[in-house]
From Swiss-Prot:
GO terms for molecular function: D-tyrosyl-tRNA(Tyr) deacylase activity; Gly-tRNA(Ala) deacylase activity; Ser(Gly)-tRNA(Ala) hydrolase activity; tRNA binding. An aminoacyl-tRNA editing enzyme that deacylates mischarged D-aminoacyl-tRNAs. Also deacylates mischarged glycyl-tRNA(Ala), protecting cells against glycine mischarging by AlaRS. Acts via tRNA-based rather than protein-based catalysis; rejects L-amino acids rather than detecting D-amino acids in the active site. By recycling D-aminoacyl-tRNA to D-amino acids and free tRNA molecules, this enzyme counteracts the toxicity associated with the formation of D-aminoacyl-tRNA entities in vivo and helps enforce protein L-homochirality. It comes from Limosilactobacillus reuteri (strain DSM 20016) (Lactobacillus reuteri). GO terms for biological process: D-amino acid catabolic process. It is found in: Cytoplasm. Its main location: cytoplasm. This is D-aminoacyl-tRNA deacylase. The keyword Hydrolase applies. Its EC number is 3.1.1.96. A motif (Gly-cisPro motif, important for rejection of L-amino acids) lies at residues 137-138. SUPFAM superfamilies: DTD-like. Homodimer. A Gly-cisPro motif from one monomer fits into the active site of the other monomer to allow specific chiral rejection of L-amino acids. The lineage of its organism: Bacteria, Bacillati, Bacillota, Bacilli, Lactobacillales.
Length: 145
């Protein structure tokens, strides 16, 4: 499982020019799955992400988490995180989980994030989406489990 987390001032995801998810201050997540991903991996990453402290405190130190700043999460599925670019000029995606495996994991991941009490918005699994966001920092963290 791979997650690219970006700290944002705001983010929105649109499908066919219709906004389907948006947040203010928080984390924008790109989420990808491998065929062998498990609920245990989901639980680990949910804990890491929801307890991450990358928002500045009164001393300018990265010491506050999402709950401290009343932040939210925008989660978007992204199988291309498993792109293989070792050969040729076109990426291969054989290392990514099939939609039959990835979609239930993505849904469960988002449910577990929301169960922590942090507001969660999502894109639509498998859809062509447009993302509009404003990075803060920028701060980008890559999780792999």
């Amino acid at each position: 499982m791979r997650v690219v987390l970006q700290k944002v001032n705001h983010a929105a995801v649109s499908i066919d020019d219709e906004v389907v998810g948006k947040i203010g201050l928080g984390y924008f997540l790109l989420v990808g799955f491998a065929p062998d991903d498990t609920e245990e991996k989901l639980n680990y990453l949910v804990h890491k992400i929801t307890n991450l402290r990358v928002f500045e405190d009164e001393n300018g130190k990265m010491n506050k988490g999402l709950r401290d700043v009343n932040g939210a999460i925008l989660s978007v599925s992204q199988f291309t995180l498993y792109a293989d670019t070792k050969h040729g000029n076109r990426p291969g995606f054989s290392q990514a989980a099939s939609p039959e495996i990835a979609e239930p994991l993505y849904d469960l991941f988002n449910q577990k994030l929301a169960a922590t009490g942090i507001p969660v918005e999502t894109g639509h699994f498998g859809a062509m989406m447009k993302i509009d966001l404003e990075n803060d920092g920028p701060t980008t963290i890559i999780y792999e489990r």
